[in-house]
């Protein structure tokens, strides 16, 4: 039996979105009314943080913690609709298919690279020097318009490469 291994890291990953597609996908998520949030990667319509369902790709859950007395707590999950608001990192992950991709490590590398690009743009456009994209996203002075503008600048940079 002859085994053939990929000749490059990205061979066979044709189902992955390009960097430009991920940026544009993240922009579409953030640009929607109420599509941007600070803090959590993903939030539902009630503003509660949601997580991808580990055992059911494409589905989302909300984690509930209940006090059961005498210092005890019980945690359970409940299914919810797809998230409707995203932080910048969450929007990139969603657009890259990070949580439901067949290639999570490649998607993570792509997200890391795009977060680095956005951070460089954010730091060059302002007097601030944020250590990471989360710090920019969660800064009290950052607005939804700032997040949209940052993604539009990145999309324009990729459009110029064509």
Language-model features: locations:
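Domain-length accessory/inserted modules outside core catalytic folds
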Residues: 1-162
């Amino acid at each position: 039996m002859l085994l053939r291994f990929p000749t490059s890291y990205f061979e066979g990953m044709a189902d992955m979105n390009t960097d430009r597609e991920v940026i544009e996908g993240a922009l579409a998520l953030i640009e929607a009314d109420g599509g941007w949030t600070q803090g959590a990667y993903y939030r539902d319509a009630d503003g509660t943080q949601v997580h991808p369902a580990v055992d059911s790709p494409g589905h989302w859950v909300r984690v509930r913690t209940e006090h059961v007395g005498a210092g005890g707590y019980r945690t359970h999950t409940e299914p919810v609709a797809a998230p409707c608001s995203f932080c910048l990192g969450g929007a990139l992950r969603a657009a890259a298919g990070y949580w439901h991709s067949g290639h999570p490590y490649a998607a993570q590398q792509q997200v890391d690279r795009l977060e680095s690009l956005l951070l460089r743009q954010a730091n060059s456009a302002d007097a601030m020097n944020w250590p990471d994209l989360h710090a920019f996203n969660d800064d009290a002075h950052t607005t939804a318009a700032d997040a949209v503008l940052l993604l539009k600048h990145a999309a324009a940079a990729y459009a110029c490469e064509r």
